């Protein structure tokens, strides 16, 4: 071959590769353009939705030959990820089906596959949106009403399954009920008897299902002025009202009605038989909830009426607003803007709907979807964007919450405190406190004065003491927190009479001179082993006076800030560990922190959190200390339960971490084994790169990890047993004493305490659930007082 010909061949090859890259680039540009057009269809523009759809259909029809799979994928993704535009996309699919029957069939198959996959992977919201989309395709003459009814009947069959959790049966019924607003009218006109039969089956199920969980999920224990309905009961009442109205609703936009003459000529597809996947123990279903109500039409000023509690429009509006929060919650400004741009805002009192939905999220039981601060920051942005109306509605909501706080769930009480203090801190702590001064006449444990006291404690964390004192009327003096300062007893006037004062003063000098931990240990040796009473401890395990002198002196020297305290603890970590060898010694450390910092709740919280992180104190020691006699006066204060929950969370995270590490190690081990066996079978060309010896954990390492996890599970179980046993003891003692004295046991203290018991169950439900059978066998037995036992039974019913 000549040099010239070789050169030509190289040029041709280069041109071929360049042309191929150009084609790929052009195809990518077209795909991106198609995706952009599909995603933006129906959004606000100068032209109508209908004309947008007509234009898009023409574009997609021309590109179906080349980009069919891409278009199928985008449309099915939109169906799941943009449920608020469901009817826009069903209309688009309907128009495409009218022009290209084959594509319509392919899309239905693709959507069915998405639905089945969502069910299989427990993506419950995605499955519900897929079902809704399939149902709305009946309105667009893409799917036959008969085949949809067969699918809905199959889903209701799940409600008759035996030996499966009720939450599974509930979800399938909920999915069907929440689909009916879209397709109910069409089914009513075409298949009325079949629809009535379906509704009858649903009614039979709803009448027989257990609602033991209901009281555990209520925000208020009272139904006045608004009933707190269980979610399926509420939706069923809304569907019945819709049926009475002949399935006519006023909220869902239906662009396909404009194209009815085109769509009705199209051939329809039948859904294949879809069998829901069988239940597996690994499946997790959505937990039940209570529908939150704060406002009714009497609360709203002149203007659009708030839809009634049992109108389907209320359900549709709330679901849409919840979805906006879910979509935009990561960016508070976008979220607030999207909420205020709600497409039907002129038909409803939007500000009231938004505030109610945000508080519904904040007070959602057992836990809110997102952090408390997420909702607080969104409300602040809403007030900035709508300063003329939103702050007034929010103030009205706050007033309603405060007036109803007497019967508020304890967990919701905490969230209300956290939100209100955060909100005040962003608005110069301005509030009309004089309007609430009637609470000053109530007992200190009553929820109203308790709320103000806790709010001021939280405001103190976000400001400083003088600012809090200045912002409050003088009548509230008894509710204002004391000045947060250390009470170092070895510097008091009577310190000379205290044992250990001399050593404490030596310790102060040594630490200020930047002594080493070993020098501190030597100074502490001057304290006799006999402790306070002059007698040796029965087990000789720890010296209370040594702990007293060391802990109070060190933390007083580090009292300037959190950072100073942390630095002191870290430097003398070894001394702490040496003194805290037993649980009793650890409880003694906690006692001294409380004695020093009893007026500074936040300092106690962060110090105990630090001691847990450094493994100076165990979780079980913290739990035992919280329920000790010493803490009786603090028992109804929020910070104490903040400490308990951070302790339990610390333990839970530790168990989850060990579990994850063990699973990963087992995966690596099994992959390494299979990789080595594959490498023996494969040819040299096909052989995969084996996992290296360094990556592969040994069986001994895996065994040690299993032992660690088992020990952590034992500690976790022990922690929960300690907590629940102490609750049972103090509550049983209170009930027995009240019965003996002939007093009403339903005191403020009792309601706080039973509420805290319920809070532990619900806040840590995933972890406690593992030990429910153990708890039932050892603690929550049938002979326990019914008031206490009911809390446990309601918790178990959440996933029953």
Curated annotation (Swiss-Prot):
InterPro entries: ARM-type_fold, CBP80, MIF4G-like_typ-1, MIF4G-like_typ-2, MIF4G-like_typ-3. Coiled coil: none annotated. The keyword Endoplasmic reticulum does not apply. It is found in: Nucleus. One of its GO terms (molecular function) is mRNA binding. The modification Phosphothreonine is found at residue 9. It comes from the Eukaryota. Its main location: nucleus. The keyword Phosphoprotein applies. Residues 1-26, 669-699 are annotated as: Disordered. GO terms for biological process: 7-methylguanosine mRNA capping; mRNA export from nucleus; negative regulation of viral genome replication; nuclear-transcribed mRNA catabolic process, nonsense-mediated decay; primary miRNA processing; regulatory ncRNA-mediated post-transcriptional gene silencing; RNA splicing; siRNA processing. Keywords: mRNA capping, mRNA processing, mRNA splicing, Nucleus, Phosphoprotein, RNA-mediated gene silencing. Pfam families: MIF4G, MIF4G_like, MIF4G_like_2. Residues 31-243 form the MIF4G domain. One of its GO terms (cellular component) is postsynaptic cytosol. Belongs to the NCBP1 family. Component of the nuclear cap-binding complex (CBC), a heterodimer composed of Cbp80 and Cbp20 that interacts with m7GpppG-capped RNA. Component of the cap-binding complex (CBC), which binds cotranscriptionally to the 5'-cap of pre-mRNAs and is involved in various processes such as pre-mRNA splicing and RNA-mediated gene silencing (RNAi). The CBC complex is involved in miRNA-mediated RNA interference via its interaction with Ars2 and is required for primary microRNAs (miRNAs) processing. Also involved in innate immunity via the short interfering RNAs (siRNAs) processing machinery by restricting the viral RNA production. This is Nuclear cap-binding protein subunit 1. The lineage of its organism: Eukaryota, Metazoa, Ecdysozoa, Arthropoda, Hexapoda. The gene is Cbp80.
């Amino acid at each position: 071959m000549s040099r010239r010909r070789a050169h030509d061949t190289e040029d041709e090859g280069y041109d071929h590769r360049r042309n191929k890259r150009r084609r790929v680039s052009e195809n990518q540009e077209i795909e991106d353009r198609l995706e952009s057009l599909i995603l933006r269809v129906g959004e606000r523009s100068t032209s109508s939705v209908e004309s947008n759809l007509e234009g898009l259909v023409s574009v997609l029809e021309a590109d179906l030959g080349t980009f069919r799979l891409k278009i199928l994928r985008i449309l099915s993704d939109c169906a799941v990820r943009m449920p608020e535009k469901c009817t826009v996309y069903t209309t688009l699919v309907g128009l495409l089906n009218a022009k290209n029957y084959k594509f319509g069939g392919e899309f239905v198959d693709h959507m069915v596959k998405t639905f089945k996959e969502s069910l299989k992977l427990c993506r419950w919201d995605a499955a519900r949106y897929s079902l809704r989309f399939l149902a709305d395709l009946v309105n667009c003459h893409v799917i036959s009403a008969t085949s949809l009814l067969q699918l809905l009947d199959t889903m209701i069959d799940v409600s008759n399954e035996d030996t499966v959790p009720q939450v599974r049966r509930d979800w399938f019924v909920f999915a069907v009920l929440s689909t009916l607003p879209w397709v109910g009218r069409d089914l009513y006109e075409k298949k009325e008897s079949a629809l009535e039969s379906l509704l009858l089956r649903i009614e039979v199920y709803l009448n027989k299902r257990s609602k033991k969980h209901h009281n555990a999920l209520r925000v208020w224990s009272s139904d006045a002025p608004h009933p707190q309905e269980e979610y399926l009961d509420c939706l069923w009442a809304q569907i019945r009202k819709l049926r009475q109205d002949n399935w006519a609703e006023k909220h869902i936009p239906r662009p396909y009605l404009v194209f009815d003459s085109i769509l009705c000529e199209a051939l329809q597809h039948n859904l294949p038989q879809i069998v829901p996947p069988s239940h597996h123990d690994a499946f997790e279903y959505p937990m039940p909830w209570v529908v939150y109500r704060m406002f009714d039409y009497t609360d709203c000023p002149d203007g659009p009426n708030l839809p009634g509690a049992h109108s389907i429009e209320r359900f549709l509006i709330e679901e849409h607003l919840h979805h906006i929060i879910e979509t935009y919650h990561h960016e508070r400004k976008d979220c607030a803007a999207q909420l205020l741009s709600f497409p039907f805002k002129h038909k409803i009192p939007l500000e009231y709907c938004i505030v109610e939905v945000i508080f519904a999220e904040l007070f959602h039981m057992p836990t809110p979807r997102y952090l408390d601060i997420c909702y607080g920051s969104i409300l602040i942005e809403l007030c900035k964007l709508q300063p003329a109306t939103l702050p007034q509605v929010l103030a009205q909501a706050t007033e309603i919450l405060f007036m109803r706080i007497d019967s508020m769930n304890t967990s919701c009480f905490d969230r209300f405190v956290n939100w209100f203090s955060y909100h005040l801190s962003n608005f110069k702590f301005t509030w009309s406190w004089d309007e609430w001064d009637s609470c000053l006449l109530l007992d200190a444990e009553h929820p109203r004065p308790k709320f103000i006291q806790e709010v001021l404690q939280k405001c103190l964390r976000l400001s400083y003491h003088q600012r809090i004192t200045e912002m409050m009327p003088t009548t509230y003096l008894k509710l204002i927190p004391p000045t947060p300062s250390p009470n170092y007893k070895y510097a008091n006037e009577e310190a000379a009479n205290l044992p250990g004062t001399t050593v404490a003063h030596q310790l102060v000098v040594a630490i200020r001179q930047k002594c080493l931990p070993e020098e501190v240990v030597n100074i502490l040796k001057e304290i006799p082993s006999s402790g306070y009473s002059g007698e040796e401890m029965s087990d000789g395990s720890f010296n209370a006076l040594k702990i007293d002198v060391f802990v109070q002196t060190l933390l007083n020297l580090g009292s300037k800030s959190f950072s100073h305290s942390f630095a002191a603890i870290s430097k003398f970590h070894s001394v702490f560990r040496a003194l805290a060898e037993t649980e009793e010694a650890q409880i003694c450390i906690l006692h001294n922190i409380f004695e020093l910092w009893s007026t500074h709740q936040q300092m106690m919280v962060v110090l105990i959190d630090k001691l847990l992180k450094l493994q100076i104190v165990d979780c079980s020691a913290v739990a035992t200390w919280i329920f000790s006699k010493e803490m009786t006066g603090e028992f109804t204060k929020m910070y104490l339960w903040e400490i308990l929950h951070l302790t339990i969370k610390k333990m839970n995270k530790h168990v989850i971490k060990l579990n994850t590490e063990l699973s990963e190690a087992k995966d690596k081990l099994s992959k390494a084994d299979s990789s080595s066996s594959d490498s023996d079978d494969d040819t040299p060309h096909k052989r995969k790169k084996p996992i290296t010896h360094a990556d592969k954990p040994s069986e001994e390492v895996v065994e040690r990890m299993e032992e660690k996890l088992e020990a952590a599970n034992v500690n976790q179980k022990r922690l929960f047993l300690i907590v629940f046993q102490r609750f049972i003891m103090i509550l049983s003692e209170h009930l027995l004493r009240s019965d003996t004295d002939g007093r009403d046991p339903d005191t403020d203290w009792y309601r706080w305490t039973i509420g805290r018991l319920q809070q532990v169950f619900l806040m840590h439900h995933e972890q406690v659930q593992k030990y429910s059978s153990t708890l039932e066998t050892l603690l929550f037995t049938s002979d326990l007082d019914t008031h206490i036992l009911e809390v446990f039974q309601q918790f178990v019913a959440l996933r029953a």
